[in-house]
């Protein structure tokens, strides 16, 4: 289900202040954020945003195709290391 048009997009006010300052001054540094739930707006296009994945900030370059999506969609929070090999399982027994 999508968010109501009446409510508008979900945006973090602190993140939007940082984005406005960065776009006005043409900063190319990474904007760190923990707000994975924030929606990407057209104002963010061309900026580098560091989205927190629970351990570190993953740098993401925002493009036009990302507008309307959430920041958290572009970083994974879980690392799959693979299942145990058959050799290791037989040694444990």
UniProtKB/Swiss-Prot annotation:
Pfam families xref list: Ribosomal_S19
Keywords, ordered alphabetically? Ribonucleoprotein, Ribosomal protein, RNA-binding, rRNA-binding
Q: InterPro entries attached here?
A: Ribosomal_uS19, Ribosomal_uS19_bac-type, Ribosomal_uS19_CS, Ribosomal_uS19_SF
Residues in the signal sequence: none
Mind telling me which GO cellular component terms the entry cites? Answer: cytoplasm; small ribosomal subunit
The molecular function terms of the Gene Ontology recorded here are: rRNA binding; structural constituent of ribosome
- What Gene Ontology terms for biological process does this UniProt record contain? ribosomal small subunit assembly; translation
Cystine links in this protein are none
- Source taxon at top rank: Bacteria
PROSITE patterns (alphabetical):
RIBOSOMAL_S19
**What function is annotated for this protein?**
Protein S19 forms a complex with S13 that binds strongly to the 16S ribosomal RNA.
Q: Which family does it belong to?
A: Belongs to the universal ribosomal protein uS19 family.
Please identify the protein, giving its name as recorded.
Small ribosomal subunit protein uS19
Q: Which gene does this sequence derive from?
A: rpsS
């Amino acid at each position: 289900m999508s968010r109501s048009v009446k409510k508008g997009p979900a945006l973090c006010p602190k993140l939007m202040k940082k984005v406005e300052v960065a776009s006005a001054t043409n900063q190319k540094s990474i904007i760190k954020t923990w707000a994975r739930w924030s929606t990407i707006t057209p104002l963010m296009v061309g900026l580098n945003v560091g989205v927190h994945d629970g351990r570190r900030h993953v740098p993401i370059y925002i493009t036009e195709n990302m507008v309307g999506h959430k920041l958290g969609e572009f970083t994974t929070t879980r690392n799959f290391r693979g299942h145990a090999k058959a050799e290791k399982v037989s040694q444990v027994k």
